[in-house]
Regions:
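Conserved glycine-rich beta-strand-loop-beta hairpin in the small C-terminal domain of fold type I
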Residues: 370-380, 392-405
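Short Gly/Ser/Thr- and Asp/Glu-enriched loop/turn motifs at secondary-structure junctions
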Residues: 61, 168, 395-399
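Conserved core segment of the aminotransferase class I/II
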Residues: 301-370
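N-terminal basic, amphipathic alpha-helical segments
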Residues: 1-129, 334, 338-344, 378, ...
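Conserved core of the PLP fold type I
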Residues: 138-273, 278, 285-286, 291-300, ...
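N-terminal small-domain helix-loop-helix segment of the aminotransferase-like
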Residues: 84-176, 183, 357, 425, ...
């Protein structure tokens, strides 16, 4: 059981036994952290889960209190809704939002990648030079699908170090994670098929569904505990679902990580209905220190989970190198890649081989995790100071996204448009859903150092939000 889960269960037992009574104030995050030996982010995650389940309530700057009516927290909650969209049409809106972010003077809180200054450009450039000098004549042929054998072996060994058995033969190197995910989707579906996605979901998933002519079954997803398995099963029972596109670690945009127990149950559910799972796992290397996470594939012994990831978030975005551990569909994915992009850049694959064998990657990851944790914590604290109590700031352990929930009558798209006038980019909730359910939400990138420029930008954004709340 994960550390945050142990704390959740411990506090539930204490509440049930009467140690904590309705209305009692729980220990502060810092005090609980010192008492339990857990990090502040782990304690915060546990408290947020208790709040989502109705055990506690929170007030900004006032801490957490035991809920006034505990009985209601033990009653089964209504399962999250499932919505369906027969014609996905979202790409044009997403394109417009992303285009606006390309302005070089823009402060990109809506950016999907980490702060580029965090990338190890010097060492990657050295690896690229070494790769160019030592590239054999046969490089082009050696790097055709499924991709460079050395690189696939390195990736397989990294999984093996976590206890995940993946053969290099089932790994296909792709031009970024999105190609890996889209090829996986093509291997499982035909135009007109139903695909389960989270709601909210990574907008790239919605774009891929639109491009491939697929129908979406959006399963409402809790910001803290993740996808509702009862609702997922209902979707699998009522529709002929051909695939599930899911994120179990540091989900974009919400930031949650499924517990290992829930991951196991999710895989068992997919196996029961014989539905392949396409797992988007691009953020799993960005966990807090000493708090590693496992992909859904870890719990799948039937090869029905297609594990997709990349180096774009953890190393450097511009390389555009990803992969899919495609299980029993590896050959089909290779054929599809051969018909579309033919192959992934051979020089870039060789660059990664040189870099990853130099042992610089682990040192870089350690520093990256530390800086992301520090920057996200500081930005979370500042947002809690700047924003009124009607705005819920959800900041969970790992990766670098913060999710803001505004009152439901607020249109985050209007806030986005006003912020653009101040050269501030944010990601409005509309980008991540095919319904209007998250139109009052905002995703922020917390990977940037909070210097005067970024602090000023957050103050401007907070002023815009307060103005909308006052209307």
């Amino acid at each position: 059981m994960a550390k945050y889960q142990e704390l959740v269960e411990q506090l539930k037992r204490q509440i049930k036994s009467g140690i904590w009574h309705p209305g009692d104030k729980l220990p502060s995050l810092r005090r609980q952290s010192e008492h339990s030996g857990l990090s502040l982010m782990t304690v915060l995650h546990a408290y947020q889960i208790l709040e989502s389940q109705g055990w506690v309530t929170s007030q900004p700057r006032s801490g957490y209190r035991v809920a006034p009516n505990i009985k209601s927290s033990n009653e089964p909650q209504a399962p999250a809704a499932v919505s369906w969209t027969e014609q996905v049409d979202i790409n044009e809106f997403i394109f417009d939002v992303l285009q606006a972010s390309k302005n070089p003077s823009m402060i990109n809180f809506g950016f999907a990648y980490p702060d580029p200054s965090l990338y190890p450009r010097y060492h990657v450039n050295r690896a690229m030079s070494a790769a160019a000098r030592n590239m054999p004549i046969s490089t082009t042929f050696d790097n055709l699908p499924p991709g460079n054998e050395q690189l696939r072996t390195i990736i397989a060994k990294r999984y093996a170090a976590k206890g995940i058995e993946i053969s290099p033969d089932e790994i296909v190197i792709t031009a970024g994670a999105l190609e890996a995910l889209t090829l996986s989707l093509q291997a499982c579906t035909r135009p007109g098929d139903w695909v389960v996605v989270e709601s909210p979901a990574f907008y790239g998933a919605l774009q891929s569904l639109e491009r491939l002519g697929l129908k979406a079954l959006s399963v409402r997803t809790d910001p803290v505990t993740g996808i509702d398995l009862d609702s997922l099963e209902r979707a699998l029972q009522t529709h002929d679902v051909k695939a599930c596109w899911l994120m179990s670690n540091f989900q974009n945009p919400l930031g949650f990580t499924l517990s290992n127990e829930k991951k196991q149950k999710l895989i068992e559910l997919a196996q029961r209905y014989n539905v392949p799972v396409i797992e988007d796992d691009v953020y799993s290397e960005l966990h807090a220190e000493n708090d590693s996470v496992y992909p859904l594939r870890m719990f799948d012994d039937m090869g029905n989970t297609m594990l997709c990831s990349s180096f774009s978030k953890s190393l450097i975005a511009g390389l555009r190198i990803g992969w899919v551990a495609a299980g029993k569909r590896a050959l089909e994915v290779q054929k599809l890649q051969l018909m579309s992009t033919l192959a992934t850049s051979a020089p870039v694959q060789m660059t990664l081989v040189h870099y990853l064998t130099s042992r610089n990657y682990e040192s870089h990851l350690k520093q990256l995790r530390k800086k992301l944790f520090e920057r996200k914590s500081k930005m979370t604290d500042l947002l809690n100071e700047l924003l009124p109590e009607e705005v819920k700031v959800l900041s969970q352990s790992g990766a670098y996204f913060i999710w803001l929930e505004l009152p439901k009558h607020i249109d985050a798209l209007q806030i986005y448009r006003e912020a653009l006038k101040d050269n501030i980019s944010i990601a409005p909730g509309k980008m991540f859903s095919l319904t209007e359910q998250y139109d009052h939400c905002i995703r922020l990138n917390a990977s940037f150092e909070l210097n005067d420029k970024y602090v000023h930008a957050l103050n401007l954004l907070a002023n815009i939000i307060r103005d909308h709340l006052a209307k």
